[in-house]
């Protein structure tokens, strides 16, 4: 059992979902194979804690879908963020595998985050003295 933001986090034998939050308790599916995947699941559940109001189990409801997405975006920004992409580049990561390893997230989580950033920012965005390119491939360029 661990505590994050005053929440209790436990591994449980969940059915279906890999993570669940109720009040101040987060359950992570016990048989999730890696710590990286568990960390990504925990990040999304923390996103629900910070952004979700009420019960959103019914994802047929548009409002619930929006809240689910908002929690996921919180997780992307918390675990990766644009500055995380820059830090990984500065560390020497030049492919998704090494970047995901450096950021301690799964490749799938990183891929989904980049897809979100591409949709939000388009082909590229500027952050401090860097340009992050999302198309045609992920790339970071330091401005001098």
Give residue spans per PLM region:
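Active-site hotspot residues in diverse enzymes, especially metal/ion-binding acidic/histidine motifs
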Residues: 1-41, 46-144
